[in-house]
C-alpha cells in the first residue's frame, strides 16, 4: 500500500492550532486544488470530543465558506480527521495560510455566536447520520480554545518525517 502524504509528516513536531498546506494538485483543466490540514489539537496529547467535533463539522463547513469563498477560492469539502485532532479542507484555489487562519478564527467566533443547539444546521434524522450525537457546548469550548491560542502555521519542511522512523 502506498504511503500517504499525511503520514510523511512528523506528528510529534506539529503545533496546534495550526494550518498546513497538506497537498496541492492541478486538475486536467488547469485548476489548482489545495488540501489544508487544520490542526485543532496537538497530536497524541489532545483530542476533540466526539459530540463537539460532530457539531463543529456541521457549523464549521458553512462558516468557513462564508469567510473564505470568493476571489478564486471555493471550498469543496471540510471533513474531520479520524484521529479527532483536526479537519481536512479541500478547495479550489490557493489562498495563503494566513487567509485560511483568518477565516478559521472568524469561523470560531461565529461558533461562539450560535445561541442554541436548535440552530445547528442539518440537525435532524434526514440530513445527519447520528443526529443525536451533538454538543453545542463542546463545539463552543473547542472554538474558545482556538481563539485563545491563535492559529500558527505548520510548514512541511519543518515536519518532514525522518525516513528511519517510517514504519517504526
Curated annotation (Swiss-Prot):
Classification via Gene3D superfamilies: S-ribosylhomocysteinase (LuxS)
Binding positions for Fe cation?
54, 58, 128
Needed cofactors, names only, are: Fe cation
What are the GO MF terms of this UniProt record?
Answer: iron ion binding; S-ribosylhomocysteine lyase activity
Q: Catalysed reaction(s)?
A: S-(5-deoxy-D-ribos-5-yl)-L-homocysteine = (S)-4,5-dihydroxypentane-2,3-dione + L-homocysteine
Q: Which domain of life is it from?
A: Bacteria
Pfam families for the chain: LuxS
Write down the PANTHER family for this protein, in alphabetical order: S-RIBOSYLHOMOCYSTEINE LYASE (PTHR35799:SF1)
Q: How does it assemble?
A: Homodimer.
Q: Which family does it belong to?
A: Belongs to the LuxS family.
Q: What does this protein do?
A: Involved in the synthesis of autoinducer 2 (AI-2) which is secreted by bacteria and is used to communicate both the cell density and the metabolic potential of the environment. The regulation of gene expression in response to changes in cell density is called quorum sensing. Catalyzes the transformation of S-ribosylhomocysteine (RHC) to homocysteine (HC) and 4,5-dihydroxy-2,3-pentadione (DPD).
Q: Would you tell me the protein name for this molecule?
A: S-ribosylhomocysteine lyase
> What organism is listed for this UniProt entry?
Neisseria meningitidis serogroup A / serotype 4A (strain DSM 15465 / Z2491)
User: Corresponding gene?
Assistant: luxS
